[in-house]
Amino acid sequence: MGERVNRGGSDESFGRRYLDALIAVVEGTRERLPEITEAGEAVAERLVAGGDLFIASVRPDFVSEGIVRSGGLMMLRAYGPDTTLSPGDTVIFGWSNTAPGQDLALLGRLRESGAFVVGIGPAPPGENSGAFLAHVDAFLESAPPLPPLPPGVVERFGGEAYPLVSLQNLALLWAFTGEMVAALTRRGRMATMYQSVLVPGARERNARYRSHRFHEAHEVPPLPAGQVGGRYLEEIGGCLRALREEAPAIERVARACAEVRGRGNQVHAFLISHFPVYQWGAPGDPKFMQRLEVMSGETPPAAELEARMRPGDLFFFLGYYRRPAKAYEAVRRAGGLIAEVIAGTDAEPDGPTPDYVIRPRWPYRDSLTPVPGYDVKILPSSGIVQAAIYWAVVGTVAETAS
């Protein structure tokens, strides 16, 4: 579990207080490992029997985090309006209590199919809670840590718990994925898993396995219950603890954003795909930044950036590995500032040097958890960590403004 996080007085920066709360909910997830393992066992049995695996939510971020993801399952597919489910299938359904009526309606449709539903989210509010959970076969509950919370965290997000709950949902999703993979190894199967496509050679490696749910041959031994999911939670907790040391950099970036806005300029944000891109405008987001067009990959839309940037504006680049040299050059031509959040590679970055830097502290190649006998690590870190940085920055801007 590591050292206890500080939940004390408000002399800590907002970034540290928010990360303390997030570390606490991730650590709380470890207490659910027996339930996670049990759910993984049930789903593994269904997959071996030929059932398909889907992921569903009324929010696009939870689904996007799960599919075609570094360290994730190749067999996992997004559930949509045209999806036909059978009783042998499994659906991972995520919610965050931001749209309970829509959640219940979608969950009802999943239940009507007869598919096995793994629910990931906080306890539903109000009198419909019992009916809601009756539609779920396995419930992996997320919730903020019990009081005392670090002071002022939820308040900076307008009272919304989403910036904490949604990221605990991801910790549960990936711990569950790890325990399901381990349960499959105890049945002689190794699921095909993605490597980050931005690692050299990964696209070719992934293409060899993409049409297979399981490896035709593998050297992965049966893995004990609790090992893979538990290791992931340890590793992602370590990433967040390391990120906590970036709190001064987070505060510098947030103050720069506040100063830019205070003089009438804009903060233009490029947020990397999968989960982080959907945090702009999510429940609790004060929308202090203007988001650039949603795109895949690591390259901001240069034409849009050229059109938007004005002297004194700030470009907030929440990226993946690499520095977008051409985008930075466009910002400099416009007389703008640059704040950079990338993991980096072994190579020296190209392009202009940014004015502000936050080191996200998640590893190059993204995935955290080794599997004995497998060629790549599994279960990613970047979605949780990069989204946490976004929330830490905008929460600090909100505190500065108050």
Task: Mark where each language-model region is.
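Glycine-rich phosphate-binding loops that contact phosphosugars or nucleotide phosphates
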Residues: 1, 42, 48-186, 264, ...
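Generic N-terminal amphipathic, Lys/Arg-enriched alpha-helix
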Residues: 2-31, 211-244
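Short secondary-structure boundary/capping elements
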Residues: 10, 35, 249, 297-301
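A short, well-structured juxtamembrane/interface segment
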Residues: 28-46, 242-261
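Flexible, glycine/charged-enriched surface loops at secondary-structure junctions
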Residues: 35-38, 53-57, 184-194, 246-253, ...
